[in-house]
């Protein structure tokens, strides 16, 4: 309905609008990692929260704000939630409650295998469920960078509650295969037959390429 679309547009604009003043103040947020002050704020203000997904104990940081707008923030490959302090603070300053999560096998989350977003998509459903346990009326934006972007995009292909209103995917990739080819070429190493062997092993061991 027009009213529903208006509310959705307002939520997305709240998350993504950049005014001239904000562009001038971009150094305040210092990219995704944040300034030293933001890192301290992240450590001091965040509340540790946990879920169980695929028998793994996963860790996140919750930043409470007023209202029912939530941002679920996902980091990239080999990173961790605290490295997203700049994004977390920016969402928080715009009035969002924020949940920044450590992906499986990253940060303080359990796990030994990194799935580049495919198994991690299931974890997003668990985090959404946790948010809804706090606030059944939550309006949720999923935000991810790199592997986090791939994670939230793949999660968006699942059946999610209507509380999820938008997805912000920053520098995701078309496929793991293309990403690893690019990495190999960047390092000037042959991707064949290494990727083919790794793909076969992944399918045999974990059930997916």
Identify the residue ranges that each predicted region occupies:
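A short loop-to-beta-strand scaffold at the N-terminal edge of the catalytic core in hydrolase folds
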Residues: 53-63
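An N-terminal hydrophobic leader/cap segment in hydrolases
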Residues: 1-52
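Short beta-strand element of the alpha/beta-hydrolase
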Residues: 68-76
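Hydrolase active-site cap/lid region
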Residues: 154-209
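Catalytic nucleophile-loop/oxyanion-hole region of alpha/beta-hydrolase
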Residues: 106-135, 139
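Conserved alpha/beta-hydrolase
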Residues: 88-110
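Gly/Ala-rich beta-loop-alpha elbow adjacent to hydrolase catalytic centers
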Residues: 144-148, 152
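Short beta-strand immediately N-terminal to the catalytic nucleophile in serine-hydrolase-like folds
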Residues: 142-144, 170
């Amino acid at each position: 309905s027009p009213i529903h679309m208006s509310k959705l547009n307002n939520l997305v604009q709240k998350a993504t609008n950049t005014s001239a003043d904000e562009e001038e103040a971009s150094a305040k947020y210092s990219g995704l990692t944040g300034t030293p002050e933001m890192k301290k704020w992240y450590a001091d203000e965040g509340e540790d929260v946990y879920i169980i997904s695929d028998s793994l104990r996963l860790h996140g940081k919750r930043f409470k704000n007023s209202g029912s707008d939530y941002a679920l923030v996902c980091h990239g490959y080999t990173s961790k939630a605290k490295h997203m302090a700049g994004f977390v603070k920016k969402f928080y300053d715009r009035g969002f409650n924020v949940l920044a999560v450590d992906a499986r096998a990253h940060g303080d989350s359990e796990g030994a295998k990194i799935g580049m977003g495919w198994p991690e998509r299931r974890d997003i459903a668990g985090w959404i469920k946790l948010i809804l346990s706090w606030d059944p009326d939550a309006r949720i934006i999923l935000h991810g960078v790199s592997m986090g972007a791939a994670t939230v995009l793949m999660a968006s292909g699942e059946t999610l509650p209507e509380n999820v209103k938008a997805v912000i995917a920053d520098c995701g990739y078309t496929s793991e295969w293309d990403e690893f080819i690019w990495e190999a070429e960047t390092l000037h190493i042959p991707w064949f037959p290494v990727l083919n062997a790794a793909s076969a092993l992944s399918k045999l061991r974990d059930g997916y390429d």
